[in-house]
């Protein structure tokens, strides 16, 4: 983890709390009357939100957690879904006195905010999503066939594993199967976190968007292939008070690639809360 700097130029405050059965690492920095929560994407950690924090640290108190299973935080005590992650972040906000706050979330972080914004609207004053995950991509015919083939082979190998003397060979076959059919994110995880990953990405959060009460700004790269622009447009339709800004040429990490523009837009949206 990097060294975070607070408004005095000294060492930032890096802390941990035991929440929901695991250690949650988070950083507090910045100054000002406003409170700003920054949430990273899957497979990353809070360091990837630092460029955003730097742009707001002179006007906001900023909270940047590492999600359980990421960065310096411990793993979930059992496979978690979006709801468990949302509960964890809600408790962190309450225990650190960060209610209400503004929030800027990227990718997986948007899943967490979506659940919280719909079920605990008092938590957020304003919301910014960038490359937000939460809407399931429809499977193409080819992808559907590939998924079905994977499930059949997996079931077959699991059956082999129950036969005496075949367990080791079956495990090796399953491992090769995962590497062939699993995504890069999936294959990078250990067995415990794979179960969490599957639970998280299998949930479609469309039903939550109409229940948002906070004003929401969606900032999207038009070249995003992970969470394509049509997802941002769909969220704009479903969230009652939402607007969409498109960053031309921006990928899933447009907020980093076009940091100056992203931060300018975000600052304009949040300036009344500083």
Predicted regions: what is each one?
Residues 1-36, 57-60, 98-99, 125, ...:
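Alpha/beta-hydrolase fold catalytic core
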Residues 250-259, 263:
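Catalytic histidine-centered segment of alpha/beta-hydrolase-like enzymes
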